[in-house]
Each structure stands twice: as C-alpha cells, then as structure tokens.
Amino acid sequence: MSEIIYGIHAVKALLERDPQRFLEVFILKGRDDRRLQPVIAELEAQGIVIQVASRQWLDKQAEDAVHQGIVAKVKEGRKYQENDLPAMLDNLEMPFLLILDGVTDPHNLGACLRNADGAGVHAVIVPRDRSAQLNATVKKVACGAAETIPVISVTNLARTMRLLQERNIWIVGTAGEADHTLYQSKLTGPLALVMGAEGEGMRRLTREHCDELISIPMAGSVSSLNVSVATGVCLFEAVRQRGG
C-alpha cells in the first residue's frame, strides 16, 4: 500500500526519519525555490526517483491543497492500535500523553500534532470513529510531526482511559465551565491531557473518566479558543511545570 504526502516540511521530515519509504517524488516544472534545493539534493543522494510534473497534475494529487511544488508517493506508514499502548507505556518513566476526543478537522488535528511534538508528548490517542484520518492534509499541517509522534487509534476511548488510570496516569480534561483553572492544576506526574472537539467539547463518557477538569481562564470577550490553540496552551503549561 502507498500514500501521498506533500509540502516541503512533510517530505523533509520523512526523508530524515525513514527514507526507505519513498517510492517516487514529483516536483513542479520550472519551480526555483531555495527551500526545495536541499531536499532535492538529499533525495538524489538517497537514490530516490524524482520526476517533473505540471502544476495541474500536482494540484490533483494534493486535492488542490498547497503543496509547495513537491508531492511524494510513499509506502504507507505504521498504524498504531490500542494493543500497542501497554508496551509503549512500559518503556516510559513519566508518560506525557494527549487525548483528542472528536477532533475531526484535518487542519486542527495536524496543528495539534505539531504542538504535541513540540511539547515532547510521547503519543497522541484518538477514537477511531471520531477523529480525522492521518491523511496528506494532516501531515502537511503537522510539518513533519505526523511522522515522529505515534498516533494511537482506539475503538473504545473510555476503556483506554481506564487502562491509563490503572497505570497511575492522571487524566486531566478541559472544560470551559470547570472552576479549577489550568494554572491551578498540578501537571508534573504521569499525565494524559484530554481535549474535546471545538464547539462540542468532550463527550459525556470521556468527561466522566477524567480525574480532573480544568478550564483556560479567558480575559476578553471570546468564550473559547480554537482546539489546536487551546491544546498548545495546555501542553506548554505542562512543559513549564515539568521543568521543560
């Protein structure tokens, strides 16, 4: 099986991490972009086939998204499932996890992955039936983070949360109405942060399985933040508390 990725950062990240996955790369005919040149040089050094293509063809492969003049056909990456989680946790002294409940917009998922990678999150957990798929759009927005951070798809999020609690991982969920704020919460131990869908928040069962609910204090007239922005705020407060 193969898949398409596009964008300079996404291609560069995979090239650095797993060049064996590349099947062929297509670049825009006549494109003279200094950012592309080192990527092309490394592709050639790895012996990866490079072909020139028209903008119309590249646009079609990227489904009219912004591809920055480069599209790659690659072997499908590893898909993480819930049965991968126990072994992963066994190897973590201080787990730092992100749970996304109902983030179905690919741009939001990609931005959340980028935040998670920057914050040093060990894995992102998503419900199989209520999450955007790890498609080319997600990988483009994630700027390489989709290739470096495990995204674990689970069939039963509540069951997975119970597993985490059995491992003494403290689960903190975000809810706008929560009295306890992010900055009053202790985020220094084994931690799973739960972010809900924008506008809807966490589902009832997800909320009930949280050990603690927190809110982000808002000073202006808006009542909430974009889910990827809120995720970044919460993750990096945890990083600050954890001495990062």
Swiss-Prot record:
GO CC field: cytosol
Primary enzyme class: transferase
Catalytic reactions of this protein: guanosine(2251) in 23S rRNA + S-adenosyl-L-methionine = 2'-O-methylguanosine(2251) in 23S rRNA + S-adenosyl-L-homocysteine + H(+)
UniProt-listed Pfam families: SpoU_methylase, SpoU_sub_bind
InterPro entries attached to this UniProt entry: 23S_rRNA_MeTrfase_RlmB, Alpha/beta_knot_MTases, Ribosomal_eL30-like_sf, rRNA_MeTrfase_TrmH, SpoU_MeTrfase, SpoU_subst-bd, tRNA_m1G_MTases_N
EC number of the protein: 2.1.1.185
GO molecular function: RNA binding; rRNA (guanosine-2'-O-)-methyltransferase activity
Primary localization: cytoplasm
Residues that span the membrane, as ranges: none
CDD domains membership: SpoU-like_RlmB
Binding site for S-adenosyl-L-methionine: G196, I216, L225
Localization per Swiss-Prot or TrEMBL: Cytoplasm
Keyword annotations of the record: Cytoplasm, Methyltransferase, rRNA processing, S-adenosyl-L-methionine, Transferase
Record's subunit section: Homodimer.
Record-linked NCBIfam families: PRK11181.1 (NF008386), rRNA_methyl_3 (TIGR00186)
Function: Specifically methylates the ribose of guanosine 2251 in 23S rRNA.
Family according to the record: Belongs to the class IV-like SAM-binding methyltransferase superfamily. RNA methyltransferase TrmH family. RlmB subfamily.
Name of the protein described by the UniProt record: 23S rRNA (guanosine-2'-O-)-methyltransferase RlmB
Organism: Pectobacterium atrosepticum (strain SCRI 1043 / ATCC BAA-672) (Erwinia carotovora subsp. atroseptica)
